[in-house]
């Protein structure tokens, strides 16, 4: 496999910014002449040679991509950030604008499956903010068929599933979440993917708690408990504590309310008001169901 010639000029920009010579970057792994031709766009490099050059400059692939994309995140990362922000703000107008742009791309490039998948995820996000908005059965089948077809889930598949939890049946959620644990073995040691896995599982846990699928909720909470979460990942740790308390409250422990309120206060203290609002709305829904269950008893 070859690295395209056009990326050579980016490597040169990074090399010169580090005040390194061609010889230092080549470092005996490839010839100086070969590296020079690559930088000038005359020839390509093999993947192994390309990674050797990055390693010799102490540059990560993510850093290279950031420069390659003109000092901005990759398109899928930008889309993910925009969606998360609009969802936290409950900004339906912004979501509809993002959707319109994605639909246009999907129509212009029908052969590119990711544009259609992105569009489905945006529609799913809209439904989470506006229950009156519906996603077609065909879209849901297209998404699930794609996820089932991928043997090893990476960042993109985790993102797709995490943001479409509200579209799927509880049985499908359990199946996918269980499969996901097996299908991310290649990537789950990457910090970014580990965080995505935790986020995905917590979304599944939320859906299960709200729909009284409590055994499954406990199954995935136990899995999370056995996952080593770094102490510095405070956001994940507070979210996990919140969901464990929410489960406890749902199964009849009124004292869990204190832990829930502490988690909400923590997010508010950190000025994460959008997150706090979403979780508070969820807790209020759970409270109503608990009261209703007590009245039935």
UniProtKB/Swiss-Prot annotation:
<dbReference type="InterPro" id="IPR010057">
    <property type="entry name" value="Transcription_activator_Rgg_C"/>
</dbReference>
<keyword id="KW-0963">Cytoplasm</keyword>
<keyword id="KW-0804">Transcription</keyword>
<dbReference type="InterPro" id="IPR001387">
    <property type="entry name" value="Cro/C1-type_HTH"/>
</dbReference>
<keyword id="KW-0238">DNA-binding</keyword>
<dbReference type="GO" id="GO:0003677">
    <property type="term" value="F:DNA binding"/>
</dbReference>
<dbReference type="InterPro" id="IPR053163">
    <property type="entry name" value="HTH-type_regulator_Rgg"/>
</dbReference>
<dbReference type="InterPro" id="IPR010982">
    <property type="entry name" value="Lambda_DNA-bd_dom_sf"/>
</dbReference>
<protein>
    <recommendedName>
        <fullName>HTH-type transcriptional regulator rgg</fullName>
    </recommendedName>
</protein>
<comment type="function">
    <text>Regulates the expression of glucosyltransferase (gtfG).</text>
</comment>
<dbReference type="Pfam" id="PF21259">
    <property type="entry name" value="Rgg_C"/>
</dbReference>
<feature type="DNA-binding region" description="H-T-H motif">
    <location>
        <begin position="22"/>
        <end position="41"/>
    </location>
</feature>
<dbReference type="Pfam" id="PF01381">
    <property type="entry name" value="HTH_3"/>
</dbReference>
<dbReference type="GO" id="GO:0005737">
    <property type="term" value="C:cytoplasm"/>
</dbReference>
<keyword id="KW-0805">Transcription regulation</keyword>
<feature type="domain" description="HTH cro/C1-type">
    <location>
        <begin position="11"/>
        <end position="64"/>
    </location>
</feature>
């Amino acid at each position: 496999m070859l690295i395209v010639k056009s990326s050579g000029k980016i490597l040169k920009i990074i090399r010169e910014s580090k005040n390194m010579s061609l010889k230092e970057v080549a470092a005996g792994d490839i010839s100086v002449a070969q590296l020079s031709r690559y930088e000038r766009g005359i020839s390509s490099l093999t993947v192994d040679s390309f990674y050797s050059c990055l390693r010799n400059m102490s540059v990560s692939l993510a850093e290279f991509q950031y420069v390659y994309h003109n000092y901005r995140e990759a398109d899928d990362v930008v889309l993910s950030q925009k969606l998360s922000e609009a969802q936290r703000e409950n900004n339906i107008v912004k979501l509809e604008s993002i959707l319109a742009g994605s639909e246009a791309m999907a129509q212009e490039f029908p052969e590119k499956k990711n544009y259609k998948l992105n569009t489905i995820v945006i529609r799913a996000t809209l439904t989470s903010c506006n229950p009156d908005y519906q996603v077609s059965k065909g879209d849901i089948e297209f998404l699930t068929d794609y996820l089932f077809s991928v043997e090893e889930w990476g960042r993109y598949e985790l993102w797709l599933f995490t943001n479409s939890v509200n579209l799927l049946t509880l049985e499908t959620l359990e199946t996918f979440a269980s499969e996901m644990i097996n299908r991310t073995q290649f990537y789950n040691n990457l910090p970014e993917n580990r965080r995505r896995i935790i986020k995905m599982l917590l979304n599944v846990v939320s859906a299960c708690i709200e729909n009284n699928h409590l055994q499954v909720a406990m199954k995935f909470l136990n899995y999370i408990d056995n996952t080593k979460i770094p102490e510095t990942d405070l956001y994940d740790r507070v979210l996990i504590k919140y969901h464990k308390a929410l489960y406890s409250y749902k199964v009849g422990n009124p004292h869990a309310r204190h832990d829930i309120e502490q988690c909400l206060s923590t997010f508010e203290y950190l000025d994460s008001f959008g997150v706090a609002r979403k979780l508070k709305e969820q807790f209020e829904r759970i409270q109503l169901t608990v009261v209703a269950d007590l009245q039935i008893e």
